[in-house]
Amino acid sequence: MTTRTILLTLLGLGLLAFLYVTFFSESTGADASIDPVRYRQELLDKRAKKDEDFRSGSDSPVPDKATFNGLSYFAPDPAYRVTARLEPFADKTQKLVVRMSDGSEEVYEKFAHAVFRLNGETCRLLIVKVDDTYSILFRDLTSGQETYGGGRYLELDPKQMADTQAVLDFNTAYNPYCAYNPGYACPLPPAENKLPVAVKAGERYTHRTETSLLLDARP
């Protein structure tokens, strides 16, 4: 084998490695490490517990617990549990001013961007950190239609986060309290966190109040 052939071979291997990192490290799609049957049951159990908390809990946002019949959800779908590539902020002092549903503002720490593939699209979402909680405030093509117009929230499990990757489980996406009670002030997703796909996973939204209708109409 000539020197030229060896160099061409090495260049070819390098190109393949680059393409792999570029196109496949963004997301592996559905998390193949889970047992679909067990995962579905665990998710249904958590939803049942949340319904009970909303129905009888002292901190429930539901004004009329007597008529509460449970939250509305999309069916569990492992395809909406994805692995994302993390792009952390080198400067940990970067902050995000978040507008609240009542017009006030709060300041959160910018933690990282999550880059992943979902429904055939490359998506990018900002992760914020508040104390020890990592959250994503997002909207998607279902917002204002099948889900709350003011957006939904997704919390990340630190146990499923590494330096370069994190699991995003949109089956656990939930509505803020202000979706059910206008007495609560809730953070609204930043403009950059509007997904170009319909996330048919997590909590749906069928209740409409004057406040929620205004948020549903937001672009």
What is each of the regions a protein language model found here?
Residues 24-41:
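Ser/Thr/Pro/Gly-rich low-complexity linker/stalk segments immediately outside membranes or between
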Residues 184-219:
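C-terminal partner/receptor-binding element of secreted or periplasmic proteins
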Residues 46, 54-96:
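Extracytoplasmic/periplasmic/luminal assembly and interaction segments
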Residues 88-153:
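Mid-length scaffold segments of soluble, non-membrane domains
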Residues 140-174:
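Acidic, glycine-rich flexible loop segments
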Residues 67-71, 95-99, 103-110, 126, ...:
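Extracellular/lumen-exposed scaffold segments
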Residues 5-22:
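Hydrophobic membrane-insertion alpha-helices, especially the h-region
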